[in-house]
From Swiss-Prot:
Pathway the protein acts in: Pyrimidine metabolism; UMP biosynthesis via de novo pathway; (S)-dihydroorotate from bicarbonate: step 3/3
UniProt-listed CDD domains: DHOase_IIa (cd01317)
Entry protein name: Dihydroorotase
Catalytic activity annotation: (S)-dihydroorotate + H2O = N-carbamoyl-L-aspartate + H(+)
Cellular component annotations (GO), alphabetically ordered: cytoplasm
Residues that coordinate or bind Zn(2+) 2: 150, 177, 230
Function of the protein: Catalyzes the reversible cyclization of carbamoyl aspartate to dihydroorotate.
Molecular function per GO: allantoinase activity; dihydroorotase activity; zinc ion binding
Source taxon at top rank: Bacteria
Cofactor entry: Zn(2+)
Top-level EC class: hydrolase
Any one GO BP annotation for this protein: purine nucleobase catabolic process
Organism: Lactobacillus leichmannii
Entry annotated with the keyword Hydrolase: yes
């Protein structure tokens, strides 16, 4: 059956236009006014924003191995509630997809359980911590989206150089968790005034920027597409800015939590504020925002990382690193930056859809006839209080719970199929 989305504010090619969208099967059939309703299931959007489905290139689903934290089903359902229709998942599961057989099993598991388009990262090295680079050609053939050891920085320059050479040969990106362990010192939050106040071990900002500087030189030497994951420091933003001026093939992401929060917002010794990289200083936060606005930061990615309540309870020294975010990212960012006038809505949408799709060669992020009907409808006028009871993720580990936000998702369609409908939507 055809689906007609009426009276939407459609975001198309950088413009917002009041028009309708007709879906036939898995594709967008037409965009315009007065499209035929006969034989179609009709949704009256009543002026809500109709946008390309969002694209998140950095999420952690814990299946197989850690399904008490999250499953592919719950993670993808949470993503759909956040308006995401394409998601790329990291390889820190058990077993790790670092060889062809394991990777193919992971892809089959993803396809059987996800309600959104799910792209799978391959590991850069075996076990995510060794110095043996995986068979990248074989993993690309099996469908690898890119390569990452996320959660672990690659410590040896020679290993990274070899990995970059191999990734460049197969034409896929190296997406790096930037962390020099010799400068990391097993900290639990940013090394700064807040850590001193709480008596907690700190993580130096230079543990990120020093390794980033090394990697940018190696990327220049190899020509690989090097992607800097969850950038968090002022120095990292400046290094990326300079690297782009030199023509190095580097892209970078920032997370919603690093854009929205700094260490100053940390509410005591609270495990829900423990993430890696940590929340940095206000100066770092402002540098990230500036980088987002001037194009140094290419895209926003959630780093959705669910854990059990027990793993996040209490003391930061014992709590796991990570924060959930795929259900709340767009609404929190819209409320903070767009409603306040700091940022255009078109830029936010591009950073969360068009940009990641374009930079990583994904067929997503654009609304046009003939394209896959991956769509998200956002209610920009309805205020909603974020509540644990509403989360579709198994994880509730976020400090944003209790905040009132605008722009939560009303409807999400993946390949023309309705995969999420808000309890607040009345058509």
């Amino acid at each position: 059956m055809a689906i007609l989305l009426k009276n939407g504010l459609v975001y198309q090619e950088g413009e917002f236009i009041k028009e309708d969208v007709l879906i036939s099967g898995s594709k967008i059939q037409a965009i315009g006014l007065d499209l035929p309703e006969e034989g179609a299931e009709v949704y009256d959007l009543k002026g809500k924003l109709l946008a390309p489905g969002l694209v998140d290139i950095h999420e952690h689903y814990r299946e197989p191995g850690f399904t008490y934290k999250e499953t592919i089903k719950t993670g993808s359902e949470a993503a759909s509630r956040g308006g995401f229709t394409t998601v790329c998942t990291m390889p820190n599961v058990d077993p790790i997809p670092d060889d062809l057989e394991t990777f193919e099993k992971q892809v089959a598991l993803n396809e059987a359980n996800s309600c959104v388009h799910l792209k799978q990262y391959g590991a850069i090295t075996e076990d995510l911590t060794s110095d043996k680079v995986v068979d990248m050609a074989a993993l690309k053939e099996a469908g690898a989206f890119a390569f990452s050891n996320d959660g672990h920085g690659i410590q040896q320059a020679g290993t990274m150089y070899e990995a970059m050479q191999e990734a460049a040969k197969v034409g896929l990106a190296i997406c790096e968790h930037i962390q020099d362990d010799s400068l990391y010192h097993h900290g639990v939050m940013n090394a700064g005034k807040k850590a001193e106040e709480l008596g907690l071990p700190g993580i130096l900002g230079v543990s990120e920027s020093a390794q980033l500087a090394r990697d940018l030189v190696l990327a220049q030497a190899t020509g690989v597409h090097y992607h800097a994951c969850h950038v968090s420091t002022k120095e990292s933003v400046e290094l990326i800015r300079i690297a782009k001026e030199y023509g190095i093939n580097v892209t970078a992401e920032a997370t919603p939590h690093h854009l929205l929060l700094s260490e100053e917002e940390i509410d005591g010794n609270n495990g829900y504020y423990k993430m890696n990289p940590p929340l940095r200083s206000k100066e770092d936060q402002f540098a990230l925002i500036e980088g987002m606005l001037d194009g140094t930061i290419d895209l926003i990615a959630t780093d959705h990382a669910p854990h059990s309540r027990e793993e996040k309870a209490g003391d930061m020294r014992k709590a796991a690193f990570g924060i959930i975010g795929n259900e709340t990212a767009f609404a929190c960012l819209y409320t903070k930056f767009v409603k306040s006038g700091q940022m255009d809505l078109s830029l936010l949408l591009d950073l969360m859809s068009y940009q990641p799709a374009k930079l990583f060669g994904l067929d997503a992020g654009v609304l046009a006839p003939g394209k896959e009907a991956d769509l998200a409808v956002f209610d920009l006028d309805h205020a909603e209080k974020l509540s644990e009871e509403d989360y579709l993720s198994k994880g509730v580990n976020t400090p944003f719970t209790g905040q009132e936000v605008y722009g939560m998702t009303a409807l999400t369609f993946v390949s023309g199929k309705l995969v999420y409908k808000s309890k607040h939507f009345a058509d």
